[in-house]
Amino acid sequence: MEELSIQWIRDRLDSDRYRVSRHADDERVADNLTLSEIRQALLTGRILEHYADTGRGRSCLVVGFTNEGKPIHVVCGVRADHLILVTVYIPKPPKFRSPYERGDRA
């Protein structure tokens, strides 16, 4: 099966074929992110990492920015041709040196 593409992700957003997992919604609230900001990040972002299918399907990490320049990471997956937002967060040290670079693993 082919890797996810940013165009596939954007197509699902544009056609309202996406779901937000409970975990992603909890993390969104914890980081004070709106669904609109997450959408902005996905529509302007790029795929940073692809993850192997470990039994839950294909997934990838997208990095994008809000209109105000706030970085957001979104782990995206697939279920029945729908985009699943698995988790969302603001990348910060020590896990990330920058929005594009992993930091030291603690």
PLM-predicted stretches and their roles:
Residues 1-106:
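Ribonuclease/tRNase effector modules and their secretory precursors
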